[in-house]
């Protein structure tokens, strides 16, 4: 897959930094409409130290955060939103279907379905090897940083 935005370019779009930046690269992008990101899940992730030491599973809340960050890339890379921040304002219909473990490549897909003023909504799914790991509906609030 071709890289549209690499790790350093993502850091120019969203304000997240290590250890909380959860997208490694963007492979598909339509400004304000859609974004597909990838996260290589490593056994060295700090959250695996406690979740769980003998049975490493990526916390579901971090999968949803990775999806929210992917949606933020779709919304914040426009000229009108440059320098702004996307806050996670809500999550609905969230379901976890597959565990995400070290060695997995997490594909993060977000489609923005509605933007009204500073509020955006989107549908999101995370997959591993084509299998659904998580799906949800996200709500974002855009504001000045």
From Swiss-Prot:
GO terms for molecular function: (3R)-hydroxyacyl-[acyl-carrier-protein] dehydratase activity. Keywords: Cytoplasm, Lipid A biosynthesis, Lipid biosynthesis, Lipid metabolism, Lyase. It comes from Staphylococcus haemolyticus (strain JCSC1435). One of its GO terms (cellular component) is membrane. The active site is at residue 51. Pfam families: FabA. It catalyses: a (3R)-hydroxyacyl-[ACP] = a (2E)-enoyl-[ACP] + H2O. Its EC number is 4.2.1.59. One of its GO terms (biological process) is fatty acid biosynthetic process. Belongs to the thioester dehydratase family. FabZ subfamily. It comes from the Bacteria. Involved in unsaturated fatty acids biosynthesis. Catalyzes the dehydration of short chain beta-hydroxyacyl-ACPs and long chain saturated and unsaturated beta-hydroxyacyl-ACPs. It is found in: Cytoplasm. This is 3-hydroxyacyl-[acyl-carrier-protein] dehydratase FabZ.
